[in-house]
Amino acid sequence: MTTRQPLYKSLYFQVIVAIAIGILLGHFYPQTGVALKPLGDGFIKLIKMVIAPIIFCTVVSGIAGMQNMKSVGKTGGYALLYFEIVSTIALLIGLVVVNVVQPGNGMHIDVSTLDASKVAAYVTAGKDQSIVGFILNVIPNTIVGAFANGDILQVLMFSVIFGFALHRLGAYGKPVLDFIDRFAHVMFNIINMIMKLAPIGALGAMAFTIGAYGVGSLVQLGQLMICFYITCVLFVLVVLGAICRAHGFSVLKLIRYIREELLIVLGTSSSESALPRMLIKMERLGAKKSVVGLVIPTGYSFNLDGTSIYLTMAAVFIAQATDTHMDITHQITLLLVLLLSSKGAAGVTGSGFIVLAATLSAVGHLPVAGLALILGIDRFMSEARALTNLVGNAVATVVVAKWVKELDEDQLQAELASGGRAISDTREEDDLGVAEGPTPTTVK
């Protein structure tokens, strides 16, 4: 029987306290808060440092260790089908809510008075986005370049190819597979070490946000923010909740299970900061490694539900605020463009804003300068985006695993009922399966 550790040693508690201290520091000592920005940036860079090798190890060991290669294509197909359906629902919900509530109505903003220079960089980055360019960008110029740049989709593509090739070698490739599995244990131990710095990273990021923009900016354009936050909550509880119930588990229990990851995301405003831990948590929840390794990384580009809600709401809000008329044809066009452009968003802070700029440029009917209206509050809405994205990808992993019959449902229910062991609460060797040996297909 294990003794429960003191509350103050829990990462969950430490991150909550750090966020609270960050808010107070940013409010009462704004210059100090702004100066703490490197703490948040440094933490996210540490996480990004190990994301590429972790994805590589997880995907390769999962695919190479599978008996039936057809199941890989089946898993990928089901995952993309799920992503497309649910993200489309998210886009539609955002569109309906912003039309009903009309948060920008009555602002009567003159576009010519807006400072477009503030959003010029986002517009330039947005114009670089194209469907063909996005597809070609998935193919890395070099293997080293994919890992050096930390491009998740490029690393994922190479990992899938490498996993297939290693599987074809059979027993001859076993030493390589064993090495990759042991290397993965080292990477996850590094993650455990980095996560001890999560409270410091969350404190720095939150102190900077409040110090730079002020609590007052939380009130400015508050109707849009409140509308967006409520929509995200309803999406998680109603839409994702219904999906979870239909597949035999509770979304509230799942949220409780990933509470530490949600707090890390809340502090850093980046769902990417929780990616390595999500790989561990979802596998521990009963999903096979091969499913987790494909669904989670792919979902960070194709299943961003919170970002989808934000994109439709922000685009129509700009139209309402600038008195730009949007009839049903314009809104359908916007929706169709977003069905494509939203798939290019990554799970990092600010990517949603770049995709919004790309969308406004592509649609043409909406004033791109209107981006300046929401630039100040975009940082505060990124928390809701990132949290919704994370929950959406957790649900997707369980659902797809169940669809392809790669889910241990007894383990799922047991883990959800217990609330899940905190990764930082147990021995690292036990968490990462070191005691189990190098077998890549073992589900912990």
From Swiss-Prot:
Name of a matching Pfam family: SDF
Name recorded for this polypeptide: C4-dicarboxylate transport protein
UniProt source species: Pseudomonas chlororaphis (Pseudomonas aureofaciens)
Membrane topology: Multi-pass membrane protein
Subcellular location(s) of the protein: Cell inner membrane
Keyword Transport in annotation: yes
Residue segments, region Disordered: 418-444
Family statement: Belongs to the dicarboxylate/amino acid:cation symporter (DAACS) (TC 2.A.23) family.
GO biological process, alphabetically ordered: L-aspartate transmembrane transport
